[in-house]
């Protein structure tokens, strides 16, 4: 371990295996707080590489509580959070709409990073249990096309890093790991990142982690597909990464100002998104979710983004997505 730490102090890059060893030590409580702080800051100042991020994610997945992984295609749609936008929960809403469109989503999430309401804050406000046993969550994925996996339930090792992370008060590699450590190990994903500089490195990380198809996105300061600005995309497909931009026109949707997506407390977000998922939402909210669902449907092989967006809008306006929220809430 001292050799690995010394490499970091010399601004050298760790291999994927070394990073995995380091993070295995971190999540099993083997590092002193000063060592942990030094390692995290050394990586941050130099800039974390895809192999270091992949090694860390591999360590966390190996330590995670097991989830009975399905053999059918399923996805996650998730953002790093921390974009500072304090917007409504686009990815959480998109998961329910995608489920109502007929694809399966195992959403991995946590409490808020920078907004007043993270994905699990919202789900709790909907009355959805955050601690369903893994078998019951898998059953919900089978029968309702959607389940939610609450990060702390599966990743107990995070607790060893929490005090240091809180004291450092700055972003570290842990801020990008959340979307990469879904214990269900989905082969497909749409992952939003808080900085355009992370789009390509996270796509390269997903390749190392063995994802079949995934899109990493950043849209005008937000960790999702945006309608107020062009969205930067790095798409991984069968081991190849393609970079491109998406505009509202690519989805056949209108442009909307970022302020139109402003969120509030979990209760306020619940009320806004209840109306949206019941088919009574605001146009800006409907179209923002439709754009994100459209890209997610592409990961399942539905290649036409305009068709996908129209399908998502029709689903939103039918109120079918709300049935999935209500059915999941009934399970505990």
From Swiss-Prot:
* Any one GO molecular-function label of the UniProt entry: anthranilate phosphoribosyltransferase activity
Where, by residue number, does anthranilate 1 bind? 79, 110
List, separated by semicolons, the cofactors it needs: Mg(2+)
Can you tell which superkingdom this protein's organism belongs to? Answer: Bacteria
Q: tRNA-binding: is it a keyword of this entry? A: no
> Which residues take part in binding 5-phospho-alpha-D-ribose 1-diphosphate?
79, 82-83, 87, 89-92, 107-115, 119
Protein family? Belongs to the anthranilate phosphoribosyltransferase family.
Q: How does it assemble?
A: Homodimer.
Any idea what job this protein has? Catalyzes the transfer of the phosphoribosyl group of 5-phosphorylribose-1-pyrophosphate (PRPP) to anthranilate to yield N-(5'-phosphoribosyl)-anthranilate (PRA).
In its UniProt entry, what is this protein called? Anthranilate phosphoribosyltransferase
Q: Please give the pathway this protein is involved in.
A: Amino-acid biosynthesis; L-tryptophan biosynthesis; L-tryptophan from chorismate: step 2/5
Q: Where does anthranilate 2 bind?
A: 165
Q: Which InterPro entries match?
A: Anthranilate_Pribosyl_Tfrase, Glycosyl_Trfase_fam3, Glycosyl_Trfase_fam3_N_dom, Glycosyl_Trfase_fam3_N_dom_sf, Nuc_phospho_transferase
Task: Give the GO terms filed under biological process for this record.
Answer: L-tryptophan biosynthetic process
User: Which reactions are catalysed by this chain?
Assistant: N-(5-phospho-beta-D-ribosyl)anthranilate + diphosphate = 5-phospho-alpha-D-ribose 1-diphosphate + anthranilate
Its gene is trpD
Could you confirm whether the keyword RNA-binding appears in this record?
Answer: no
Q: Name one GO cellular component term.
A: cytosol
The residues that the entry says bind Mg(2+) 2 are 223-224
């Amino acid at each position: 371990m001292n050799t690995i730490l010394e490499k970091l102090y010399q601004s050298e890059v760790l291999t994927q295996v070394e990073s995995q060893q380091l993070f295995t030590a971190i999540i099993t409580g083997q590092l002193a707080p000063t060592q942990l702080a030094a390692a995290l800051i050394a990586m941050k100042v130099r800039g974390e590489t895809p192999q270091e991020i992949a090694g860390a994610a591999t360590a966390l997945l190996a330590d995670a509580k097991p989830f009975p992984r399905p053999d059918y295609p399923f996805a996650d749609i998730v953002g790093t959070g921390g974009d500072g936008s304090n917007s409504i929960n686009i990815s959480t809403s998109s998961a329910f709409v995608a489920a109502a469109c007929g694809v399966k989503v195992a959403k991995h999430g946590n409490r808020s990073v920078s907004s007043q309401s993270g994905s699990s804050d919202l789900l709790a406000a909907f009355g959805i249990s955050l601690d369903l046993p893994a078998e019951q969550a898998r059953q919900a994925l089978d029968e309702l096309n959607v389940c939610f996996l609450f990060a702390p339930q599966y990743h107990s090792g995070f607790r060893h890093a929490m005090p240091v992370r809180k004291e450092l008060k700055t972003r570290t590699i842990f801020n990008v790991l959340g979307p990469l450590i879904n214990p269900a190990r989905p082969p497909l994903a749409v992952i939003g990142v808080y900085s355009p500089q992370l789009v390509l490195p996270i796509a390269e990380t997903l390749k190392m982690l063995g994802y079949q198809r995934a899109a990493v996105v950043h849209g005008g300061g937000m960790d999702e597909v945006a309608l107020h600005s062009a969205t930067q995309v790095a798409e991984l497909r069968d081991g190849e990464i393609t970079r491109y931009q998406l505009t509202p026109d690519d989805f056949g949707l209108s442009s909307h100002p970022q302020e139109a997506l402003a969120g509030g407390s979990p209760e306020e977000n619940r009320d806004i998104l209840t109306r949206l998922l019941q088919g009574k939402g605001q146009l800006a909210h409907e179209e923002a979710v439709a754009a994100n669902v459209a890209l997610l449907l592409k990961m399942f092989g539905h290649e036409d983004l305009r068709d996908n967006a129209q399908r998502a809008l029709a689903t939103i306006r039918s109120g079918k997505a709300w049935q999935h929220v209500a059915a999941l809430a009934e399970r505990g």
